[in-house]
Amino acid sequence: LSAPPKLTLKTMANLATKWSWGIGMLGAKRRGFGNIVGHVKGISDTSSLGSWTAEQFDPSLDWDKIAKLKEQWGGKVILKGILDAEDAKMALKVGADAIIVSNHGGRQLDGALSSIRVLPSILEAVGDQIDVHLDSGIRSGQDVLKAMAMGAKGTYIGRAYIYGLGAMGEAGVTSALNIIHRELDTTMALCGETNVEDLGRHNLLVPKDFEGRWQEYVGAGNA
């Protein structure tokens, strides 16, 4: 996956067999990132967008730079992408105000640990010294309840509202959020709870080896 796409002989030969699709695309509106192209200085097409995007990533980013960013910013800093207890401790050490336990969505590796499976070890590592939130896999109100009952202070969604956006635009996003809210409300009622602050492990049936199995596997892999 690259931008702009590179035309090869194989690609061109493949396109030649899709001539009807090609004709249709000639009359279609050119697609791009509407919130960037035309709004960010110097970004006018896919090619310049690709170069600009590459410039936004700093491969030398480390914990010391996050601490300096916190100092220069002067506001609250929330770190997303924490999937390990040691990283959670480092986030606390460099001054993060909150962390989001989150995996990478499959864009870097084909697989990763689920965020809710590592949540207990992260909470144990940092306690209540820092707010711990969670995303990755939140698709329903029941998912929200599970995460908060496990100890997360809050949850985030992405794909859930994107589905609504794709189907019905702004109204679809509102509908998706309302559905999740109703599901959470219903699940809480069936659990006998009226306040999210009262949610806890007593609302869940968590297997004793829920976390232990992956820790054992990781330990064996590092031996």
Language-model features and meaning:
Residues K89-M90, D110-A112, V144-K146, A167:
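Short, well-ordered secondary-structure micro-motifs
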Residues L1-K93, G105-Q108:
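Active-site entrance/lid segments in N-terminal catalytic domains of soluble metabolic enzymes
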Residues K80-G81, S102-N103, S136, G158-R159:
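Short beta->alpha connector loops at strand-helix junctions that form conserved
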Residues L61-I66, E71, L113-G127:
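Short loop-to-alpha-helix "cap/lid" segments that border enzyme active sites
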Residues G32, R117-D135, R139-A223:
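Alpha/beta catalytic cores of nucleotide-metabolism and tRNA/nucleoside-modifying enzymes
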Residues Q72-K76, L92-G106, V126-Q129, G151-T155:
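Glycine-enriched alpha-helix->loop->beta-strand junction motifs that scaffold or abut catalytic
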